[in-house]
């Protein structure tokens, strides 16, 4: 891990606090988050992405806006329960990420997780992300079974992705289920990519 100077650490802290405040402005009354400030509709992927950031920030000691996280949790659980598979939109990946964030927050929706797992034709990204959710709740055997049936999807444009984002998510899942050799291989590939001058998405 890199040790930051005090000035750099203060800068990081300031930026995280500013991000939390700015993202909160995008939260709707139903608890979801819109893509843009002033938006009228929640974006499923963005809602999970912001919630993921909230959880990690809170773990580091940052204070979240009052009530914001609970509203997000309520929204995520409602959407998880009401979700219906629409293969043409690839929304299985969005559901898997939603379920992962709920598990990460300590509020796993096991019923929704099991329903998604029972579908026969979900994407590689969805299976792998769902595997991470199962690993987080201690069901390592189920997680590994899902993980071992997956390959790396080349792209996921609908959800702002790339093969490198997918590899990073695969690396995390591998770590969660204890497959350190797989995780190390992807970490080396990602590190090499990050050290290059190639364009990478924000995710």
List where the protein language model places each region.
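Large, well-folded core regions of big proteins
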Residues: 1-203
């Amino acid at each position: 891990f890199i040790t930051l100077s005090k000035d750099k650490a203060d800068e990081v802290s300031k930026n995280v606090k500013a991000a939390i405040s700015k993202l909160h402005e995008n939260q709707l009354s139903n608890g979801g988050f819109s893509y843009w400030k002033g938006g009228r509709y929640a974006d499923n992927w963005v809602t999970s992405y912001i919630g993921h950031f909230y959880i990690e920030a809170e773990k580091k000691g940052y204070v979240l806006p009052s009530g914001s996280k609970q509203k997000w949790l309520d929204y995520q659980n409602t959407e998880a329960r009401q979700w219906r598979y629409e293969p043409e939109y690839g929304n299985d990946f969005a559901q898997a990420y939603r379920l992962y964030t709920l598990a990460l927050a300590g509020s796993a929706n096991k019923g929704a997780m099991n329903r998604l797992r029972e579908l026969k034709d979900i994407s590689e990204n969805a299976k792998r992300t769902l595997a991470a959710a199962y690993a987080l709740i201690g069901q390592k055997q189920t997680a590994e079974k899902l993980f071992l049936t997956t390959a790396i999807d080349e792209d996921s444009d609908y959800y702002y992705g790339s093969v490198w984002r997918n590899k990073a998510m695969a690396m995390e899942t591998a770590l969660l289920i204890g497959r350190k050799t797989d995780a190390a291989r992807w970490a080396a590939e990602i590190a090499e990519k990050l050290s290059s001058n190639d364009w990478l998405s924000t995710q």
